[in-house]
């Protein structure tokens, strides 16, 4: 549909790469990609759970900021990006704000459903932001869906929906117009996409207390 035969990707925020958004792509399509995370001993951990021969994968142990993101990409990326995925539980909005317009065909970004449907909010652009340290609940992180959609519109993308967990939003470059490529797509009211059942809140002592809203 989007003329992608063997997806090239960049994913920021992958942990040890066992649950990353591009993991299936790497295993299935033998692609070229870059994964970035601040996880200690990242390359060792990733190599322990993938077949490294399956693709041309660059593994970067870096803490991404709005100041270094473009430099890191320009230094390491020598290919056209089909899929860009971002999930760092923090200053995601400010990273997107610094990215060049239309950086990829498909863009996947985490959002915080706890912020609700009407608020256009994000966390402050703090160096070394850590959701666990910023607020004991662990719930103040990332960006609201409304704010994410609006910044992505400025970056020349349109919204096509989310995953069923209601924490990852999907966007398509306007180079692939919705009336041509997704003409039968139905976009629900934004309230639908923030109705999440994920319960990862903590009490002041750091224990999970499973608040739903």
Spans of features found by a protein language model:
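Rossmann-like AdoMet/SAM-dependent catalytic core
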Residues: 1-10, 18, 24, 29, ...
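SAM cofactor-binding core of SAM-dependent methyltransferases
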Residues: 1-75, 79, 83-86, 113-116, ...
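A structural signal for short, well-ordered beta-strand segments and their strand-loop junctions
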Residues: 11, 35, 85, 106-110, ...
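Short aromatic/hydrophobic-glycine micro-motifs
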Residues: 30-31, 38, 104, 156-158
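Short alpha-helical
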Residues: 41, 90-91, 166
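Hydrophobic packing residues within well-ordered alpha-helices of enzyme cores
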Residues: 46, 73, 95-99, 171
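A short alpha/beta connector and helix-capping loop motif
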Residues: 56, 94-133
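Active-site glycine- and acidic-residue-rich loops that bind
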Residues: 85-95
């Amino acid at each position: 549909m989007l003329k992608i035969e063997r997806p090239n990707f960049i994913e920021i925020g992958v942990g040890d790469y066992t649950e990353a958004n591009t993991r299936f792509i790497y295993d299935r399509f033998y692609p070229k990609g870059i994964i970035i995370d601040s996880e200690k001993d990242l390359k060792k951990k990733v190599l322990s759970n993938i077949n490294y021969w399956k693709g041309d994968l660059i593994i970067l142990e870096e803490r991404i900021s709005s100041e270094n993101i473009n430099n890191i990409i320009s230094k390491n990326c020598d290919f056209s990006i089909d899929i860009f995925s971002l999930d760092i539980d923090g200053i995601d909005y400010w990273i997107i704000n610094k990215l060049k317009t239309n950086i990829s065909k498909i863009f996947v970004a985490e959002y915080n459903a706890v912020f609700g449907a009407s608020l256009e909010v994000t966390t402050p652009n703090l160096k070394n932001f850590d959701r666990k340290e910023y607020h004991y609940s662990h719930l103040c992180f990332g960006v609201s869906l409304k704010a994410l959609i609006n910044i992505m519109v400025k970056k020349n993308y349109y919204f096509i929906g989310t995953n069923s967990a209601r924490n990852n939003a999907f966007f398509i470059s306007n180079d692939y117009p919705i009336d041509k490529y997704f003409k039968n797509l139905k976009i629900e009211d934004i309230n639908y996409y923030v109705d999440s059942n994920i319960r990862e809140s903590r009490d002041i002592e750091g224990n999970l207390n499973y608040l739903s809203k």
